């Protein structure tokens, strides 16, 4: 759990606002001009942010609900700015797939407190319809265009509470190396020392990535930067209770190789591991060539997600999983001389070496993110 500090509780009843959420004037001023806040209530549960639902009377006389997330300090600043920009980019590309972002900003009466405001959608947390969900996701990947023609994003985005290195780069292998290296630096600070882990990670970055990802642009092939959600597991997907429309939220988006989106579908910790999701996605979006190395690329991409999960949850088994996956890839693409290879972890990975069925966790574990209690947008 983060050290998030809730904004100071203020008496809002005098302003005619019902509810238990301490509404800051900065939030009120961010709403459409002439709006009146009728109620503000804490809503949902989150490991890294405080969340609430606002009921607002618009100038045209209609009532509208908004969802708000807040976080404190410089990490909160980066999270709220990053998520607003990520969700805005997704919304511009596929508006029927994203709750509409409104704005982000800073509280005026609470120190170093930041917020992100978006449309409220009343959603169920049931697994989404695979056909609709995967068709929309593939459309996002196909139709998005990087504004620079490069991989990356114009502001840092976050995976959980940690910022990602998403600086623009024309090379996907170089971009992914920097993305993974930044994740490893964070993980090293949060977890106990493990020299063998650091050694195999360095060889993965120096030898495996150039070989495995470099092959994507061999023989005249060109890799398109696609906008990805970046943190896509079932906890960040919901279905509108009123019409069955599938939405995604809590994004850490950037422009990437589209297969990167499937990294978090690999492990056993989440229900989206179901083969049906991978099958439906690949009916809409082709695997990149060389197709025979698709599973190895997915394993590599999953290493990044597992490293960040380990940073959020020191001592988690996924650190061992990431280590064994890197050992597997090094053995296949950049083997050590006989007798010099590091030993495997005795803790086995979550998926057999011969198959993958999807799903990885977000930075929040199930016990830290009470999905059952949050049937709509959550942090």
Q: Which residues are covered by each model-predicted region?
A:
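Juxta-kinase regulatory segment immediately upstream of eukaryotic protein kinase catalytic domains
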Residues: 2-40
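An alpha-helical support segment within catalytic cores of ATP-dependent transferases
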Residues: 23-31, 106-109, 145-229, 240-243, ...
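C-terminal alpha-helix
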Residues: 30, 139-143, 324-332
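Short, surface-exposed acidic
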Residues: 33-39, 194-200, 286-295
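ATP-binding pocket architecture of kinase catalytic cores
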Residues: 41-174, 178
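Active-site Asp-x-Gly
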Residues: 172-177, 181, 185, 222-227, ...
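ATP/Mg2+ or Mg2+-diphosphate-binding catalytic cores
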Residues: 309-379
